[in-house]
Amino acid sequence: MSSLPTPSSAASLPTHSITSHALPDATLGGSAPSRSIALAGASNFRDLGGYIGHGGQQVKWRRLFRSDHLAALTPQDHAVLAGLRVARTVDFRGQAESAAYAYALPGVAYHPLRIEPTVIQRALDLQRSGHQITAQDAVVLMQDTYRGFVNDSAPRFAGLFELLLDSDAPTVFHCTAGKDRTGFAAALILMALGVPRDVVMHDYLLTNALYQRPQGMGTHAPDDVLTVLWRVQVDFLEAALHGVEVEHGGLDNYLERVLGINAAAQKRLALLYLEPSSAAG
């Protein structure tokens, strides 16, 4: 029977030396900053700036960054982050993941908001019961994982918003691959700022063009299963957003009743992270 990586091995991600290059983005003007930031030790590091939110105002560049884990950053990468004036990181990785690949960035505040990865454990449970996991099984597991973000992980996402509302100091939030926990967090932030849902989905799917899966990771699992587990799909994020709508009556209700982001807090979020109207566009 083929085996999937255990949760502990999933945490043990080998470093990589693939440098990501700026990804052309048709939504950006020619003089706009690069969305994807080239780092030797993180392939999925990118800026949420430039999208158009409430009132036609643009999300500020160089304030909100999403990424895969930061434990493999090189000294040159550290210099890039210093140049970006990164002041704090938010780490969504579970305890084993963050312990296996810990990091510390000089002068940068570290905020762990643990969301334990469950999809690998559930896949292992299926295998132990005698079921050979298929790609479709993996899709269902991923959708269930995203549904769990909406309620089970709500306190962690509330913690992220609390930090963002405290100041607009440049912030990197990340998990291991920067695609699922980080992807839902980025979607919440952008939608709270008024970025249209189709644009949010566009940003979410950029992971498939950028993220480099660590070499040798999960090689005993079928390739089609690995493709599901290490990439993102529209249906994954839609599963979470559907839960927000059906269970909570929409984004505004979810933000206020579940995450504690009321109208005043949403207004402050916009003040901190959207360019003034005269500077938008």
Model-derived regions: residue spans:
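Cys-dependent protein tyrosine phosphatase-like superfamily
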Residues: 2-171, 184-281
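Histidine-centered active-site/metal-ligand motif
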Residues: 174
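Ser/Thr-glycine-rich phosphate-binding loops at phosphate-binding pockets of nucleotides
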Residues: 177, 181-182
